[in-house]
Amino acid sequence: MAKITKTFQYGKHTVTLETGEVARQASGAVIVKMDDTVLLVTVVAAKTAREGQDFFPLTVDYQEKFYAGGRIPGSFFKREGRATEKETLISRLIDRPIRPLFPEDYKNEVQIIAMVMSLDPEIDGDIPAMIGASAALSLAGIPFKGPIGAAKVGYNDGQYILNPTVSELKKSQLELVVAGTANAVLMVESEAALLSEEVMLGAVIFGHREMQKVIQVIDSLTAEACTQPSDWVPPAKNDALVIALKKVIGGRLSDAFHIRDKLQRRDAIAAVKDDVIQQLAGRLEVEGWNLAELLKEFGELEYRTMRDALLDTKVRIDGRSLEAVRPITVKVGVLPRVHGSGLFTRGETQAIVVTTLGTARDGQVIDAVTGEYKENFLFHYNFPPYSVGECGRFGVPKRREIGHGRLARRGVLAVMPSLDEFPYTIRVVSEITESNGSSSMASVCGSSLALMDAGVPVKAPVAGIAMGLVKEGERFVVLSDILGDEDHLGDMDFKVAGTSEGVSALQMDIKIEGITEEIMRQALQQAKVGRLHILGEMDKALAAPRAELSDYAPRLLTIKIHPDKIRDVIGKGGSTIQAITKETGTQIDIQDDGTIVIASVNNAAAREAKRRIEQITSDVEPGRIYEGKVAKIMDFGAFVTILPGKDGLVHVSQISSERVERVGDKLKEGDVVRVKVLEVDKQGRIRLSIKAVEEEVASI
């Protein structure tokens, strides 16, 4: 295939799509250029599915090459290693809108690799990667119901900004990524500075409208490349098997979905499934059916049973109305030795969230393509297998845990104090101890409580809620505070976090087309009502940050010195600063601008360290009397240390009003004496006098 190039203007940026020259053995390959940011995105699809494959094996890997920013990796091996948190999050961002566009029965392995090969510091790789993945999939000749478009939306001074630069985002009240097809929004990911629901919805609609040009260009590229349509044919539906299943099941699935307890409901459905397999086992070989086919159709009947009951009765699995939030219990200060903690329980979803305060040096140093930077607010989400009553892998966080942690972090970020206002590194850890839907939003609620319990001066409490949707034709219901089954069997997972004043984070994943603006508006308004209810329940336990930090949290004292005096505080080979930290038991961080932060659980120790630093950095004042220690005896006088690192000379003539023949007759090393500063010359040399002090005392 000859090289094909398409170029278009996208916001302030020029975007170019190229195919046919690089990675020609891949099923589909596109080079995407957005100004100076360049990515190679490839797709490879297996010709057939593996034997017994019962899920769609789609893998997405996004990687930023360090050479893209003109840097060599800082790791020991000097090469790219395991995916960073940012790479994992962007991989998920690519995956989420494209996964629903593959047929349910398609089980061939598909791998997408997006490599950032040149990076303009002002243009991130996320939107080009999503555009490239959409184009490469469209060129791959596989059953993909795309293409999709993607856009980033900012908001400032009442105006939406299409694909803002990194600099513009720093001033923006909103960072929202939206992806979708020509007719439908499929995915939204955002963080916001407590904006209204109307502004958030407007951003989604604005982004979807603007991305249409991306979809049109990809369609044009695919047409010019003469991409052959997929010859994959879905397996025919086995009507005889479905009839047999329905007959054996009867009303038992419907009865199981009336059981309110999650584990009991799961066991009841499993019992029905086991009985069905046992009853139909003898017919599988005779009828030419297979077990995988039977299980698939059983899952389809589960799906239909729950959805039909919900649409017909407007009553949910656990007996709630559509808008009702599950019962909430809230506790704070549940762990005695930590700096702040909260236990948040909503129905069968529960999180223990802990806040730890540290100094600036505890911040995480990120070695990124654009350079090193430090992160001083860390949020970690853990989802152990026991939280859903299962055995499983425990330890290294999976992609889902990283994604949920980032969403929860976005939820509280808008209310966090700046480093100047609260100079601590803050780590929040959410331990999910039970899960039946919406654990990331439980983490938002729990983190708000733990932060306030730790005394972090957040601007307002934050709560989060997950919304769902079930839609069949023109009939639909919007669900507040969804269960795990409602998420799994529904058409939308719509998470909203915020305060009583506005939205701080929004994440939306939609599995179907036909979600209208009106449905999204209803979901946002219903979410607001639920969020305000949850905030009211949280306020009963703790409505504002505690006035005092935990007894076990470090106290920070901040002082400012002239940058030229930093070397005096550090001392030769670090001797001075090491002595202060060792003798006072404090931790001291010195910044290049002269800011010194002293950390200690003991207030008195911190104050002593501060006093000693102030002594070292204070200027010697002529005419002032100091108490000093004789450091060295010379023939012509004695050197006396009046401040740390500051010695002055007491000439033999200034030791006493009487004649002194030998200095050693009057002074010895280690003697503590009172001296008056006579002069500090231009070279910083200090002249001292003991005699002047004696004369001054005598005159009084």
Curated annotation (Swiss-Prot):
GO process terms (BP): mRNA catabolic process; RNA processing
Catalytic activity: RNA(n+1) + phosphate = RNA(n) + a ribonucleoside 5'-diphosphate
Alphabetical UniProt keywords: Cytoplasm, Magnesium, Metal-binding, Nucleotidyltransferase, RNA-binding, Transferase
SMART domains linked: KH, S1
Binding, Mg(2+): 487, 493
Family matches, as CDD domains: KH-I_PNPase, RNase_PH_PNPase_1, RNase_PH_PNPase_2, S1_PNPase
A GO MF label: RNA binding
Domain KH: 554-613
Protein EC: 2.7.7.8
Localization (cell): Cytoplasm
Cofactors named for this entry: Mg(2+)
A single cellular component GO annotation: cytosol
Protein origin, superkingdom: Bacteria
Group of enzyme by EC: transferase
Domain S1 motif as annotated: residue spans: 623-691
Entry's family note: Belongs to the polyribonucleotide nucleotidyltransferase family.
Primary role: Involved in mRNA degradation. Catalyzes the phosphorolysis of single-stranded polyribonucleotides processively in the 3'- to 5'-direction.
Cited NCBIfam families: polynuc_phos (TIGR03591), PRK11824.1 (NF008805)
Subunit structure: Component of the RNA degradosome, which is a multiprotein complex involved in RNA processing and mRNA degradation.
Descriptive protein name: Polyribonucleotide nucleotidyltransferase
Organism expressing this protein natively: Xylella fastidiosa (strain Temecula1 / ATCC 700964)
Gene expressing this chain: pnp
